[in-house]
Amino acid sequence: MKELFDYITQDIHRKHSFNKESGFHERVVIDGYGPIRAKFDTGNGTHASMFVVDKIDVSGKTVKWEKDGKKFTSKLQGTSHPTHNEKIDERPIVLVNVTFNNKFYTDVPIGLSIKDSKSTFLVNRDLITRFKVNVNPNRKFVLSKWIERSDGNDA
């Protein structure tokens, strides 16, 4: 009986049930960096969510990156090769800790990019599933407080 209870109580063994609705823009907190405006992209099937940073230096299995003057050193987990308009953008993947909707998520894979994008932090489908939310494309900041755009180019 104990094995059955242990099996059922693990999230991975349960059918996905998303009864929380989020907006397509929400506030997400990246551990060590702070709050950021995130776009929940249901069409993003890449291996990692995308985060636009200022500098990236990959040497061996170590990634040194910088965003708004804050410096980070992370272990390289792999490389994402998303294609957009037939252009391939190589993004080193690192793991970060993220807080969303008062829940703390460890080892969230993010692909770092220095190319300017319409969104500073683009959440992929895997992370949306991990957040256990339905995304309403007509609403913003349903589960979190409003946060301004990082720059004038943000959507």
Spans of features found by a protein language model:
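Pepsin/retropepsin-fold aspartyl endopeptidases
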Residues: 7-155
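Short acidic, low-complexity intrinsically disordered linear motifs used
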Residues: 1-7
